[in-house]
């Protein structure tokens, strides 16, 4: 299949704003590819439509900056870099600049190699593998080779794929529905089956292949796999402790009637400390243990102490466990955790791992078990999963778990050290502190304990529900002090002035909308330290899509945790809301835009804020 044919589909999809029309166009494309090309091309096409050449769980990226892509365009076409930058600035899209350059190319390719979908895909995957001296030049040469053989339209989408900005308006939901329409009956059940398979594989290409070849039975067979991480189940914000306890307490009659389950804690909720750390999944298969973040990044090398703790204090050889990695200051005399920003240094550093592990030791707080000895536990109730979890944790690891009759957060302070000499003084693994509660009083006391121990708040969970990866579910709630921070996506930033003129700052902040787009809710003017400003600039500079004056439009990829005074109604931003005095809490290295807070949540916080104000004034 010629890449230009796929580029034409891209153009048609980008031209319509109607979701159903996008789904129809993609469904037709997927069917045509499956019926008229080699079978292996369907998963490649589906992945490229999402602007990717790797699955989310693969630890790889194309890794070419916009500047590198611009150099490749110039090399392929002979057009001066200054002209390419002019087009880029005028159009706000380096892909458009590539199309203009190919159309206006100075040098012509005499013996062009056919530009197929397979060639583009395999070349971009190869580009990501280059390392060491001269790797950047090799990357640019390979991309220039693709552009040299491309039409203007094909060049536009090659460059957009390289820079991670397809501009198709196609999210995971549209691809899901297109697959359900193409290969199933497009009922709600069909779309749900495709979504379940995507959640369990984190690879839409694998799902496409299965549903095309095997239909519904192929999706039903999809299950958890070791070393293929899944997205976490997320909790909704609770209006109050009382509301959460009332709504989530397991109704024994409902459970027995609808699920044939007997609960040991009928009418109760599970309450856990909410830790401000790195959410992680620990996979073990025999001697091989891997650690993954909520963004599915493999951070095993950065956390050898976590690996050692898991090996020594989890009595099983095949499992997937979920935990929170919480950092501590070894020089401190208490267990107050370090900030997430400090802990995040451990993800960012891949050198001197032993040194930084000792300077920022972590405790691994285990709170869920998703698979054990080859058996997926996702459909089991939370209570059943925790019972299985307790059977494989060492005595010391479970000693920190809270009983329903104990609420002093400092009463269990034993530290479980690992056997490895290198990390013996700094590693621990504990069961997340938790209790069962049937009343608001019990829950409120435990919440105060969590805050007193320096943690974020509490999680309140219905014990009778399964694990649903990738979803923000209503049967788990989080409670933190108000106004709690929002996780927001950076869409624009401005070059600073004076001594900080080399840095980008003052970012515009956006939340997710129901249709998968972004809506801005404010702009941050303060809150960066010099170190944070440098880190922020290094993170967003490769994401620049367009520059007007001192303002840069960015590919939405960076998420910030933002604190603020209040939420106001505003016509300044397209969300209809504005944050008053937003300030940086931390750069969320562990969070991607799909996990940012929603406009619905901003609206709910505004309504709750208004209600609180009216009650205060009475």
Curated annotation (Swiss-Prot):
One of its GO terms (molecular function) is ATP binding. GO terms for biological process: cell division; DNA biosynthetic process; DNA recombination; DNA repair; lagging strand elongation. Keywords: ATP-binding, Cell cycle, Cell division, DNA damage, DNA recombination, DNA repair, DNA replication, Ligase, Magnesium, Metal-binding, Nucleotide-binding. ATP binds at residues 272, 279, 294, 324, 367, 472, 478. The active site is at 274 (n6-amp-lysine intermediate). It catalyses: ATP + (deoxyribonucleotide)n-3'-hydroxyl + 5'-phospho-(deoxyribonucleotide)m = (deoxyribonucleotide)n+m + AMP + diphosphate. Its cofactor is Mg(2+). PROSITE patterns: DNA_LIGASE_A1, DNA_LIGASE_A2, DNA_LIGASE_A3. Its EC number is 6.5.1.1. Gene3D superfamilies: DNA ligase, ATP-dependent, N-terminal domain (1.10.3260.10), DNA ligase/mRNA capping enzyme (3.30.470.30), Nucleic acid-binding proteins (2.40.50.140). InterPro entries: ATP-dep_DNA_ligase, DNA_ligae_ATP-dep_bac/arc, DNA_ligase_ATP-dep, DNA_ligase_ATP-dep_C, DNA_ligase_ATP-dep_cent, DNA_ligase_ATP-dep_CS, DNA_ligase_ATP-dep_N, DNA_ligase_N_sf. DNA ligase that seals nicks in double-stranded DNA during DNA replication, DNA recombination and DNA repair. Belongs to the ATP-dependent DNA ligase family. This is DNA ligase 1. It comes from Haloquadratum walsbyi (strain DSM 16790 / HBSQ001).
């Amino acid at each position: 299949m010629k890449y230009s044919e796929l580029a034409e589909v891209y153009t048609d999809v980008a031209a319509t704003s109607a979701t159903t029309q996008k789904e129809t166009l993609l469904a037709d494309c997927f069917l045509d590819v499956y019926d008229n090309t080699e079978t292996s091309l369907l998963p490649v096409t589906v992945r490229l439509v999402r602007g990717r050449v790797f699955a989310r769980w693969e630890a790889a990226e194309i890794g070419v900056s916009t500047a590198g892509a611009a150099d490749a365009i110039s090399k392929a076409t002979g057009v001066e870099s200054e002209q390419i930058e002019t087009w880029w600035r005028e159009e706000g899209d380096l892909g458009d600049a590539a199309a203009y350059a190919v159309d206006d190319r100075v040098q012509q390719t005499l013996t062009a190699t056919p530009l197929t979908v397979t060639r583009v895909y395999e070349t971009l995957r190869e580009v990501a593998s280059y390392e060491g001296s001269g790797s950047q030049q090799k990357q640019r040469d390979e991309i220039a080779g693709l552009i040299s053989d491309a039409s203007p339209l094909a060049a536009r989408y090659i460059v957009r794929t390289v820079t991670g900005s397809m501009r198709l308006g196609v999210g995971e939901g549209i691809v899901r529905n297109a697959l359900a329409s193409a290969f199933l009956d497009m009922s709600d059940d069909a779309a749900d089956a495709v979504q379940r398979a995507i959640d369990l594989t984190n690879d839409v290409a694998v799902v496409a292949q299965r549903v095309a070849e095997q239909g519904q039975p192929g999706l039903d067979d999809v299950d958890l796999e070791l070393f293929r991480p899944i997205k976490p189940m997320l909790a909704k914000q609770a209006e109050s402790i009382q509301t959460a306890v009332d709504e989530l307490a397991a109704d024994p009659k409902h459970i027995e009637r609808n699920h044939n389950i007997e609960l040991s804690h009928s009418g109760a909720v599970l309450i856990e400390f909410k830790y401000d750390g790195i959410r992680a999944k620990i996979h073990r298969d025999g001697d091989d243990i891997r650690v993954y973040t909520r963004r599915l990044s493999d951070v095993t090398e950065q956390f050898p102490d976590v690996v050692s703790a898991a090996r020594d204090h989890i009595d099983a050889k095949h499992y997937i466990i979920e935990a929170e990695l919480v950092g501590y200051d070894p020089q401190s005399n208490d267990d107050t955790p370090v900030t997430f920003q400090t802990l995040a240094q451990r993800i960012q550093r891949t050198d001197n791992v032993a040194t930084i592990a000792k300077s920022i030791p972590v405790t691994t707080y285990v709170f869920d078990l998703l698979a054990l000895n080859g058996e997926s536990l996702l459909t089991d109730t939370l209570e059943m999963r925790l019972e299985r979890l307790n059977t494989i944790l060492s005595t010391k690891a479970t000693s920190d778990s809270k009983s329903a009759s104990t609420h002093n957060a400092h009463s269990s302070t034993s530290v479980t050290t690992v056997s490895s000499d290198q990390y013996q003084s700094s590693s621990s693994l504990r069961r997340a502190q938790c209790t069962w509660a049937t009343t608001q009083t019990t829950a409120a006391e435990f919440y105060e304990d969590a805050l007193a121990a320096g943690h974020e708040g509490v999680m309140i969970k219905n014990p009778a529900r399964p694990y649903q990866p990738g979803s923000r579910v209503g049967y788990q709630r989080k409670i933190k002090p108000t106004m709690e921070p929002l996780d927001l996506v950076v869409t624009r930033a401005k070059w600073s002035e004076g001594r900080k003129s080399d840095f980008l700052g003052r970012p515009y902040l956006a939340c997710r909308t129901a249709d998968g787009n972004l809506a801005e809710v404010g702009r941050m003017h303060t809150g960066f330290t010099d170190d944070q400003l440098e880190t922020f600039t290094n993170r967003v500079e490769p994401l620049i899509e367009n520059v007007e004056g001192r303002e840069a439009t960015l590919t939405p990829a960076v998420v910030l945790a933002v604190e603020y005074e209040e939420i106001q109604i505003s016509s300044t931003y397209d969300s209809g809301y504005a944050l008053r005095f937003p300030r940086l809490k931390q750069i969320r290295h562990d969070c991607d835009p799909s996990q940012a807070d929603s406009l619905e949540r901003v609206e709910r916080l505004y309504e709750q804020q208004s209600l609180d104000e009216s009650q205060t004034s009475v």
